[in-house]
Amino acid sequence: MERNDPRYQAYVEILKEELIPAMGCTEPIALAYAAAKAREVLGVLPDSVQLQVSGSIIKNVKSVIVPTTGHLKGMEAAVAAGIIAGSAEKELEVISEVSEEKKSAIRDYLQTVPITIEHTEQGHVFDIVVTERCGQDYARVRIADYHTNICRIEKNGTVLYEVPLLDETVQEDARADRSLLNMQDIWDFAETADLRDVADLLERQIRYNNAIAEEGLLGDYGANIGRVLLTTYGNDVSNRAKAKAAAGSDARMNGCELPVIINSGSGNQGITCSVPLIEYAKELHSGKEKLYRALIISNLVAIHEKTGIGTLSAYCGAVSAGAGAGAGIVYLCGDGYQAAIHTVVNALAIVSGIVCDGAKASCAAKIASSVDAALLGYNMYKCHQEFKGGDGIVMKDIETTIKGIGRLGKDGMKETNEEIIRLMIE
């Protein structure tokens, strides 16, 4: 793919837009970001806070520890952290620097200031409205569709900033066009890209995500899935790939304060796309250039799949990210495009039934299962086995299958998502 090709430029922009740092699970961090921005607009410490959120936000914040808060969980903790210690200009690193004094102040604020939560659906799966009041003054901030998309800022009845929200397809047009993504072009781009355009992004992903994976194995986080895998199944590369990715999630879901480079708005997906490839590259002595090109494949394949599914869904994002990792591992192992697309199809056929029931400790095990499915899918191809079109949700070709997965995750699982939310808030 030539550098002056519009697809080339779009793919570079997509990677720049997606591979950004975030500290902590991104949904509570988005709440903290909105709260910090509202506090900035209000200009004083609010004496009451009202939070209106979609069900998928409730699902993804309820059970996860908010970093830099001293192991506090939930929406109230995320909002209080943003108000007391947030720096809105840092976006998804909004609460990356919190002193012990501020941690104590967050706890005091939670005990003394009313924070009310309302479950509301306004036509957007990802939707946050934070209203902060002090006396007769108020400030309101809305984030919708994706984690950093502040679409409305209001103070005392005056709209200070507003971006029209139509639907997710139109909203995406503000960023690089994801509809240009397809498997063949992703592969061609990865093979021909001038790495100077993306090397800094990918090196940061390697550094950040490997660091939190290492921390997950050293510390005591959640259910310690990474350590369980290494203890039980040994130290071969396929198990290390699963264990280290799981360990990164162990740490991230359970209060670790290290940042992660995300994919599709998710730290867990960013870890899943990268850490297994880092382990395979070490084992194979692949060199930086080959690892970079493999990471281009894994990241863009995951984004391609997730574009159809949507930002938040009852379809587990680790599944799509794991399939992307499988395609990247194929490249590292020296196989070609046909091996990659069969690996992706096989992986999606195996684990597309995993549901998302929010961010919490078991995400690490789902990541391990998804990476395992990708490795099995690749081994199936090497043994001349495959799931063929007509086998369940497997369609006639890779693009039709990915499109079908998007329909399943976005449309078919709406009711599933609603029932999961009802179960979680009973």
PLM segments and residue spans:
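Glycine/charged-rich beta-loop-alpha catalytic/anionic-binding loops adjacent to active sites
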Residues: 11-21, 57-65, 251-262, 302-311, ...
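Conserved phosphate/anionic-ligand binding catalytic regions in large, soluble enzymes, centered on
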Residues: 21-37, 258-275, 316-320
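Early transmembrane hairpin of solute transport permeases
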Residues: 29-132
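Flexible, glycine/charged-enriched surface loops at secondary-structure junctions
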Residues: 45-49, 90-95, 117-118, 196-202, ...
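Acidic-glycine-rich active-site phosphate/pyrophosphate-binding loop
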Residues: 1-12, 45-58, 236-255, 287-305, ...
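A structural signal for small-residue-enriched, beta-sheet-centric alpha/beta enzyme cores
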Residues: 2-3, 8, 22-26, 53-60, ...
